[in-house]
């Protein structure tokens, strides 16, 4: 099993692993054998930072999971939506898949769309955005980012893409803009950087 990465879905976290102040809905999530989502944070050896999601944006809970409890692991790259769907987010996923496949880069849905595809639990609604993760181990020119964003903005719903770099993640929409520095999300927290791929930024 590969080391868990941000946005991976993990199954196997026991209810007993939750702290005493965990809300009842979080206990219900684990009791129902639903997965947790890997989040960015520094953890002690043998642990991974995860998040639990319930119904709606207000039901989110941060926790820690032991690596030995992982029974199954699924990354966004393994998820693909159904060919037909009434949900705009999944319609958008189907419409942009050929473009992203042609890029040659690993990618996949995260957020509500990824969770629904992986679990079969309907968490999307007609106003849901589509969240995507695009692995960019090599720098993506800002002009290329703007071209890709122009294509994605023609989809049936808003699409938010996180570019996963060796240093962390940056929003495609922000990288396609003209600001000199952009917000990089890393295990050490968010910070503004000029180049999300630069080794010196990772060491900062």
Curated annotation (Swiss-Prot):
GO terms for molecular function: nucleotidyltransferase activity. The keyword Nucleotidyltransferase applies. Transfers 2'-(5-triphosphoribosyl)-3'-dephosphocoenzyme-A to the apo-[acyl-carrier-protein] of the malonate decarboxylase to yield holo-[acyl-carrier-protein]. This is Phosphoribosyl-dephospho-CoA transferase. It catalyses: apo-[malonate decarboxylase ACP] + 2'-(5''-triphospho-alpha-D-ribosyl)-3'-dephospho-CoA = holo-[malonate decarboxylase ACP] + diphosphate. Its EC number is 2.7.7.66. Pfam families: MdcG, MdcG_N. Keywords: Nucleotidyltransferase, Transferase. It comes from the Bacteria. Transmembrane segments: none annotated. Belongs to the MdcG family.
């Amino acid at each position: 099993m590969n080391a868990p990465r941000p946005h991976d879905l993990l199954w196997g976290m026991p209810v007993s692993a939750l702290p005493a102040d965990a809300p009842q809905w979080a206990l219900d999530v684990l009791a129902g054998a639903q997965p947790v989502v890997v989040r960015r944070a520094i953890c002690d050896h043998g642990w991974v930072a995860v998040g639990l999601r319930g119904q709606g944006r207000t039901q989110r809970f941060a926790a820690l999971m032991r690596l030995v409890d992982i029974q199954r692991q699924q990354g966004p790259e393994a998820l693909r939506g159904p060919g037909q769907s009434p949900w705009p987010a999944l319609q958008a996923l189907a419409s942009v898949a050929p473009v992203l496949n042609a890029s040659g880069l690993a990618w996949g849905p995260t957020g509500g769309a990824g969770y629904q595809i992986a679990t079969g639990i309907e968490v999307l609604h007609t106003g849901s955005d589509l969240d995507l993760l695009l692995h960019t181990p090599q720098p993506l020119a800002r002009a290329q980012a703007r071209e890709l964003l122009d294509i994605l903005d023609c989809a049936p719903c808003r699409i938010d893409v996180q570019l996963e770099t060796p240093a962390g993640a940056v929003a495609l929409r922000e990288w396609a803009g003209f600001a000199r520095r952009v917000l990089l999300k890393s295990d050490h927290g968010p910070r503004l950087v000029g180049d999300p791929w630069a080794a010196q930024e990772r060491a900062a």
